[in-house]
């Protein structure tokens, strides 16, 4: 029995839903009923008892419109063939994370809005899917996972011992301009280390990504990592007399260097109040691709240079030195980064950043927690799939079923169910043919699902407690007792 809730425009201070029952009946034609010209749907846009959000008006014409079968722009369906690829990718994420000793966590998709706007940066704030819920609370769909991680670490307090090595794979939402490999929803793999101040943490994180790339067939000639430090930009701004309070804004602008024309970068930097001379010098230094050249410009005594030298030394020890390069322009757009930052990039330049991360030592204290050192990375699913397509490295992942069980007589459907249950109890996958079908159809289905063997339940064999088994790869066929069927 179905019911539709329709709410009148405002009968009182609280909703009084009108219930229309028995709209659909299998034994009689649908009843005719009239729909008011103007309705308010209680479920739409979060409208509820608080009255905090006014729901859109729905007309009778709207009610009868054909539903758009496509998902909302920027989102995806995952039919079986795409789900197999997603599971394959996620399994690699999980296996690599566990290989490095990390534990899996997860967080709510819906969080308080303040969690993301406090320290995320202007770009993230502009891209939030946020709204007011029925309790007049500002909430948002998570655009990333790191703030949720910080919240959970603070919540757990002293019940967890440091260092923490956690990973997560979660769906994230950003209302951004879509490009190849960039959607408004995506799944993101994060690995984070809480409680380690040394550069060894960043070195291990990059090592884990390299391990992942190698597992799926990506080489150092396909992708690389651009590495720098936020402290480099801090020292440069200090050298050129740029006020410290402009640092966050400048980072957001510099992060666009490879995305918009350089004249636009200069114009945006000019709007911050930085002099033309300082802008020219700053951009000249940020074009440096050699750590030695940077050291000549800002001196070798700075903390940024020491950290970066150590990272490159550790890269040799971990065995991925050919994967990384210095690039002073890498700053990352998120406001909470404090030290080393890195981005994975496509060496052919056809895709945007594949992954990115860095150190965020002060993020937890921003939310009221202790000032723990921390670093991590985020790795989206959409870009890597595009890269695998580009390199012709997508795996062939057909459906795989060990057994197809089929009754040769409609009166033996119950017997076929018994056989299927016996095999499933032994941990084997079974596709049970639920209708009476000709053998030609069954063989076609077996080929489609890549079945290993066909188990046929015939009247004569079943009376003897046996079934016929056909091994599809070799054509071998034999009869076996149900109790001996493995």
Swiss-Prot record:
InterPro entries on file: aa-tRNA-synth_II, aa-tRNA-synth_II/BPL/LPL, Anticodon-bd, Anticodon-bd_dom_sf, His-tRNA-ligase, HisRS-like_core, HisRS/HisZ
GO CC terms in record: chloroplast; mitochondrion
Domain of life, per lineage: Eukaryota
Subcellular localization(s) per the UniProt record: Plastid, Chloroplast; Mitochondrion
Keyword Transit peptide annotated: yes
PROSITE patterns: AA_TRNA_LIGASE_II
GO molecular function, one term: ATP binding
Class in the EC hierarchy, top level: ligase
Entry-linked CDD domains: HisRS-like_core (cd00773)
EC number(s) stated in the UniProt entry for this protein: 6.1.1.21
Gene Ontology BP annotations: histidyl-tRNA aminoacylation
Protein family according to the UniProt entry: Belongs to the class-II aminoacyl-tRNA synthetase family.
Protein name, UniProt field: Histidine--tRNA ligase, chloroplastic/mitochondrial
Taxonomic source organism: Arabidopsis thaliana
Upper classification of the organism: Eukaryota, Viridiplantae, Streptophyta, Embryophyta, Tracheophyta
